[in-house]
Amino acid sequence: MNEMQRYLAEEVAEDLADGIINRREAIRRLGLLGVTGAAATGMLATVGAEAAAAGSEHSGNRDGRRTGSESSWAPVAQESITFAGPRVPLMAAWAPTARPRGAVLVIHENRGLNVHISTVAGRLAASGYSALALDLLSEEGGTGSFPGEAEVAAALAQIPPERHVEDMKAALTELGRRVPHKKLAAIGFCFGGAMVWRLLTSNEPRLAAGAPFYGPFPEGGSFAGSRAAVLGVYGGLDSRVIATLPAAKAALEAQRLRFELITFTEANHAFFNDTGARFNPHAAIEAWRRVLNWFDDAVDDDDDHD
């Protein structure tokens, strides 16, 4: 089991510990990820004990706030596109704006390219950044070719992270073609946050900014070759991902990149997803404001915008 496969499996165990899925569904999802028998039982027990010790059980709605909502952010309409990839055409949702401040690559959670992630691209476009939300399952026929979220996560886990990086680099090339002479940024959530970290640590000089949300930093990651300004966003209750924050900080400091790593103390993993059980509206609104300010600083170099 590689680093990303373990992360995705432990996320299933956390969903059980937080009451989002039941034990039967957790066992089924772990089986799709190749974790069965005693290994599955042990993982569920270990993560459950850690969650209880951290006081995060059922923490998706600790303070009584609603656990999902229609977003109040008005997105620009998105269109489905395909473009050249390293092996096959890649699928994406494209949200353009007439006078872009820059262009942003959006990387989805372990649920794949769904309406929520497409809408994030639309929100970015509404804020002045043309955005492309990539489907990292393009080679498998796209997210829509799978029967459910568990199967999507299992498929993502089987793909070498290096292939995801190649596809993201192709998406940056497409962004540069569609939005020429503008700086590029990347944002990702959960699994997508981990992928943005990997893109930032892949000797990729084209990124002016990156905003990984609650994604684990890769073991041994180095920012050599990067010039990006990095805003890392974490939930304080997300102990598993928070544990990788010191490594991210050390690597950023080693390369002397501009960065900020912010933690929303009362928020959990996936707090930005307004369709999910751990949605925290206060943290999500503030995180979005911080991201837009970060991109305005690092990506937008045009003084003509109002």
Where are the regions that the model predicts?
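N-terminal secretory signal peptides
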Residues: 1-25
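N-terminal twin-arginine translocation
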Residues: 20-28, 37-59
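N-terminal cap/lid segment of alpha/beta-hydrolase-fold proteins
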Residues: 58-96
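Cap/lid segment of the alpha/beta-hydrolase catalytic domain
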Residues: 137-162, 270-275
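Alpha/beta-hydrolase active-site loop
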Residues: 153-177
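Primarily recognizes the serine-hydrolase "nucleophile elbow" in alpha/beta-hydrolase
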Residues: 170-226
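Short beta-strand/loop motif that positions the catalytic acidic residue
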Residues: 232-234
